[in-house]
UniProtKB/Swiss-Prot annotation:
Keyword Ribosomal protein: yes
UniProt keyword list: Ribonucleoprotein, Ribosomal protein
Family per similarity comment: Belongs to the bacterial ribosomal protein bL35 family.
CC per GO annotation: cytosolic large ribosomal subunit
Protein name, entry field: Large ribosomal subunit protein bL35
GN (gene name): rpmI
Gene Ontology biological-process annotations: translation
Ribosomal protein in keyword set: yes
GO molecular function list: structural constituent of ribosome
Disulfide-linked positions: none
InterPro entries found in the cross-reference section: Ribosomal_bL35 (IPR001706), Ribosomal_bL35-like (IPR021137), Ribosomal_bL35_CS (IPR018265), Ribosomal_bL35_sf (IPR037229)
Stretch forming the signal peptide: none
Annotated organism of origin: Paraburkholderia phytofirmans (strain DSM 17436 / LMG 22146 / PsJN)
Amino acid sequence: MPKMKTKKSAAKRFVVRPGGTVKRGQAFKRHILTKKTTKNKRHLRGSTAVHDADMNSVRAMLPFA
């Protein structure tokens, strides 16, 4: 059986909190910002939690987290 390895792209994008939830950054905040309203950009600040439907995929990508 091959070694389990962490997906490095996922390790750079996600942070596992002590309670077991996974933190991720918001999308749609990199470019093409002129057509987005200030309110929309403000709501995209900060981070949020990964949804329950995606947790199995994230856990598989981060086996040691």
